[in-house]
From Swiss-Prot:
It is found in: Cell membrane. Produces ATP from ADP in the presence of a proton gradient across the membrane. The gamma chain is believed to be important in regulating ATPase activity and the flow of protons through the CF(0) complex. This is ATP synthase gamma chain. Coiled coil: none annotated. GO terms for cellular component: plasma membrane; proton-transporting ATP synthase complex. It is a peripheral membrane protein. F-type ATPases have 2 components, CF(1) - the catalytic core - and CF(0) - the membrane proton channel. CF(1) has five subunits: alpha(3), beta(3), gamma(1), delta(1), epsilon(1). CF(0) has three main subunits: a, b and c. HAMAP family: ATP_synth_gamma_bact. Transmembrane segments: none annotated. It comes from Streptococcus thermophilus (strain ATCC BAA-250 / LMG 18311).
Amino acid sequence: MAGSLREIKAKIASIKQTSHITGAMQMVSASKLTRSEQAAKDFQIYASKIRQITTDLLHSELVNGSSNPMLDARPVRKSGYIVITSDKGLVGGYNSTILKAVLDMIKRDHDSEDEYAIISIGGTGSDFFKARNMNVAFELRGLEDQPSFDQVGKIISKAVGMYQNELFDELYVCYNHHINSLSREVRVEKMLPIADFDPNESEGHVLTKFELEPDRDTILDQLLPQYAESLIYGAIVDAKTAEHAAGMTAMQTATDNAKKIINDLTIQYNRARQAAITQEITEIVGGASALE
């Protein structure tokens, strides 16, 4: 019985130590989430402005009806997928949901590796696709908690360049969209060709008047890739925010479960201790009775 009590007590101590770790990780993730949410809000200011400028420009008389490879759909021979996952675990179902969605989509829409290419951001996704011998064109690991454009700009520019060079004919970004600290949703958004401009968006505000220098095509050739890159970067910031929220929720769940186990073990320990004391009393009384 004494051995059993020691084992239970050791388990309680071990789980308490684990709960302290998960509790600390929860607080760290909460802090990262707060910073990521602010970064996402700050980026939206830039994103909304460049979208407004691009929308006004495309619907102005100077460029209305113009053709550009970034805007024009072409026959799809090969599709590109930017898939955003985390580099580490302990984020609940954050990675599994997006990876399952991408895997199902590729199996449904493509018959061979020649029909798609994956651009993986995050080590978990890279390892997942490589283990299944899927076509990973290139990857980026070790993303910062609040990734700057400088860190991801190269891979984003490379993805847009592959589209411009017709290495694939459409580009999707697959990621977890952050809704709030408790929920997220899988999104697969078509980034290229750019086709999400609504003519009605320009209603309600005065259109910007443009004077184009040096010429229309040069302006579009520079502006449209920059706009596409901003969309992709926005998805990365959004995905990172969802990752921190998932990590916080997972660690909170782990801490709550640890507390429940500690409570159950404490009850078990008290019952075992009470049984041991009762047994000792019974033995003492029995021994005293034998001496009479």
